[in-house]
Curated annotation (Swiss-Prot):
It holds the Pfam family GrpE. This is Protein GrpE. Residues 33-43 have a biased composition (Basic and acidic residues). One of its GO terms (molecular function) is unfolded protein binding. Participates actively in the response to hyperosmotic and heat shock by preventing the aggregation of stress-denatured proteins, in association with DnaK and GrpE. It is the nucleotide exchange factor for DnaK and may function as a thermosensor. Unfolded proteins bind initially to DnaJ; upon interaction with the DnaJ-bound protein, DnaK hydrolyzes its bound ATP, resulting in the formation of a stable complex. GrpE releases ADP from DnaK; ATP binding to DnaK triggers the release of the substrate protein, thus completing the reaction cycle. Residues 11-23 have a biased composition (Low complexity). It comes from Rhizobium etli (strain ATCC 51251 / DSM 11541 / JCM 21823 / NBRC 15573 / CFN 42). Homodimer. Belongs to the GrpE family. The gene is grpE. Coiled coil: none annotated. Residues 1-43 are annotated as: Disordered.
């Protein structure tokens, strides 16, 4: 028995060494696998950063949507009557033409009936323009201003050496704005033959009306 044990001793030692080596390799592999796996805390941090970024983007989109909606609602309130206002301006134009068709002499010598009719038409015109103004429609007053193609439509030139070139000197048809938009440009006559306009900062039509 002793001889057999002695005889098998080296083989047993080699087997044990191989087993230990295999175990060590397995442990090393296990350690390496654990090392390759990401840290749960780092994963949570990355996930938190991603969620925060998504939240900020969503908040920005919601804020932009809110602003855009507010602007669209404001525009809808301001400009929803634009089509109706244009139709009413056509009626107002007809009232003005009717009044302008009556000569000063006819007005001066008019009987009570004609005088009452004229006053009624004038009152109707004023009431209509006042109603439009309450809805944001304002009349342009371009006489004396420098011609501005954004608000005026030049119909003819008037020789005039007393005022700078391109000064509005006559209004053929009144112009109107609604909010910050031109509802209808004023049809005007502009001066020609005068001195060149002085280069200076000119307030916009809206600024002058608001002053």
């Amino acid at each position: 028995m002793t001889d057999e044990t002695t005889k098998n001793g080296p083989d047993a030692t080699a087997a044990d060494a191989a087993a230990d080596a295999a175990a060590n390799v397995e442990i090393d592999n296990s350690v390496q696998e654990e090392a390759k796996q990401p840290d749960p805390l780092e994963l949570l941090k990355a996930e938190n950063a991603e969620l925060r970024d998504r939240y900020l983007r969503l908040a920005a989109e919601m804020d932009n949507l809110r602003r855009r909606t507010e602007r669209e609602v404001k525009d809808a309130k301001s400009y929803s009557v634009a089509g109706f206002a244009r139709d009413m301006l056509a009626v107002s134009d007809n009232l003005r033409r009717a009044l302008d068709a009556i000569s000063p002499e006819a007005k001066a010598t008019a009987d009570a009936g004609l005088t009452t009719l004229i006053e009624g038409v004038e009152m109707t015109e004023r009431s209509m323009l006042s109603a439009l103004e309450r809805h944001g429609v304002r009349k342009l007053e371009p006489v004396g201003q420098k011609f501005d193609p954004n608000f005026h439509q030049a119909m003819f030139e008037v020789p005039n050496s007393e005022v700078p070139n391109n000064t509005v000197v006559q209004v053929v048809q009144a112009g109107f704005t609604i909010g910050e938009r031109v509802l209808r440009p004023a049809m005007v006559g502009v001066a020609k033959g005068g001195p060149k306009p002085v280069e200076a900062e000119i307030n916009s039509v809206f600024d002058e009306k608001d002053a």
